Amino acid sequence: MIDKAYEELIKMKEKIMRDSYTIHKELSESVESILNELWINYSPESVEHSKKLLAIDGGMWVKETRQGVIFIVNAKAIVFEGINEINSEGKVLVHIFSPGNYAKERIELLMQLLELQLALKLVENVDYVLLDGSFSKKLGRHKSELKVDLLDDIVSIDKILSLEEKDEDNMLRFLIAENQLVLSELVSRYKDKLLFISKNSKSSDLFKQAYSDITILELFTQNCGYSKILEKKIDENYILSRKASKLLSGLNYYFTNLRLEPSERLFRLDFFNADKIFEYLKVLKPVSLKGYPYPLIKVHKDVRVGKEDRERIYSILEMKRKDISWWPSQFY
């Protein structure tokens, strides 16, 4: 950054502070009358220590080269009893796409599919499944009037059938449908066990403000509790798989924002049984670490691709590294 930018920042500092205070005050005035209706202070008197929780997350490494897009996706599922690990299982896919369209979208869908396959494989032996990300993100936001039928008779927990498709556009559609097929199987058979957890939700359904609901609640509440439970209907226009559409269309799911520890951050929880909200709080509170479920923190740490991982990948693939440390990566 050039020196002039710092000079301007020093000049503007007081104005920024004044404007920040004004914005905070105006926001407070606009929500204070409804805050008590939309936020419920609650901390369970008793908690459930003995429930088996399955925490699932995925990670990826992607490198675009002139020849194609090389990537590694991995997903892991850990079974916890309280905060104690009982066992775990992982899935990995190493692949290369030729240069073309939708590479990033397809890779993200592949990672998610590994997560959902693990969930479907292990769900029967646990009480609850903790999935990273909202239900709507898992379902996908790809509107289409054309349904995909080719995969409807096959729900695999081991293979990824969409990779057999060579056309990039078709592969993307098939991956969306394959994700939705596995997700619909999970929901239709085990929906009361599924908890979708988002730490960075941008939803504004509650307060209808320009700021996210979580931002407002973190600014103006400190106690443990949850926000008013809202209901959403699954829109079949977002479901490409015809079989998944039959299983999911018109089904309702619910969401709220939780705080498990005083003054800590909130997260959004999506679920299918509104009557079990107190049960969910009893289960999640004893595994909370600074307000977030520890099982998801642990599994995220295991699948995240860190600096040492990247260096090792480059070494194995014998890929050229930068000779000049400050040289922008896009130029080598």
Swiss-Prot record:
Residues that, per the record, bind Mn(2+): 57, 132
What sort of enzyme, by top EC class, is this? hydrolase
Listed InterPro entries: DSB_repair_nuclease_NurA, NurA_domain
Give the enzyme's EC designation: 3.1.-.-
GO BP: any one term: DNA repair
Record's note on what induces expression: Part of the nurA-rad50-mre11-herA operon, these genes are cotranscribed.
GO MF, one term, reads: metal ion binding
Q: Which domain of life is it from?
A: Archaea
Alphabetized SMART domains for the sequence: NurA
**Keyword Repressor listed:** no
As recorded in UniProt, coiled-coil segments are none
Per the entry, which co-factors are needed? Mn(2+)
Task: List the keywords (alphabetical).
Answer: DNA damage, DNA repair, DNA-binding, Endonuclease, Exonuclease, Hydrolase, Manganese, Metal-binding, Nuclease
Query: What role does it play?
Result: Involved in DNA double-strand break (DSB) repair. Probably acts with HerA to stimulate resection of the 5' strand and produce the long 3' single-strand that is required for RadA loading. Exhibits both single-stranded endonuclease activity and 5'-3' exonuclease activity on single-stranded and double-stranded DNA.
Q: Which family does it belong to?
A: Belongs to the NurA family.
What is the official name of this protein in its record? DNA double-strand break repair nuclease NurA
From which organism does this entry originate?
Answer: Sulfolobus acidocaldarius (strain ATCC 33909 / DSM 639 / JCM 8929 / NBRC 15157 / NCIMB 11770)
